[in-house]
């Protein structure tokens, strides 16, 4: 089981989101957090997306996800893990201009710590107070509309 958390921030307003799945991996939860955050934006935005997941941030910023798509979601050694979620992420990103920012986890980044707490809380609901690796994503939109 795992949990994910995301916080949308705009002009002093914040919207917290969280969820989880009974059967999952930390990488699927990291991707899910980003997808849910981007999908929650009401219109195309300029987004600064902050995450402690090198898996997610590097896969996009280094262009790997686009290469995987071009190769039919295959890479050396077989199928791309989580191809279903990578496809959802590309769809969720499409209307937006996204700047990707990696932050180190668990070093006091305010939104990262809060996202971690959201993910842990949801996970504990699923697991009756057990611990877990969790997901952390902060998305910031820069349009003049409510999140």
Predicted regions and their residues:
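RNase H catalytic domain
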Residues: 1, 34-114, 118, 123
């Amino acid at each position: 089981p795992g949990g994910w958390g995301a916080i949308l921030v705009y002009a002093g307003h914040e919207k917290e989101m969280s969820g989880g799945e009974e059967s999952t991996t930390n990488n699927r939860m990291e991707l899910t957090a980003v997808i849910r955050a981007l999908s929650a934006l009401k219109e195309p935005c300029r987004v600064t997306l902050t995450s402690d997941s090198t898996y997610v941030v590097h896969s996009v910023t280094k262009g790997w996800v686009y290469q995987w798509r071009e190769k039919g979601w295959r890479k050396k050694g077989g199928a791309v893990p989580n191809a279903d979620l990578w496809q959802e992420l590309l769809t969720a990103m499409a209307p937006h201009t996204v700047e990707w920012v990696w932050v180190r986890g668990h070093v006091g980044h305010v939104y990262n710590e809060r996202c971690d707490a959201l993910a842990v809380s949801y996970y504990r609901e699923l697991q009756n107070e057990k611990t877990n690796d969790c997901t952390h994503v902060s998305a910031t939109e820069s349009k003049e509309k409510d999140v």
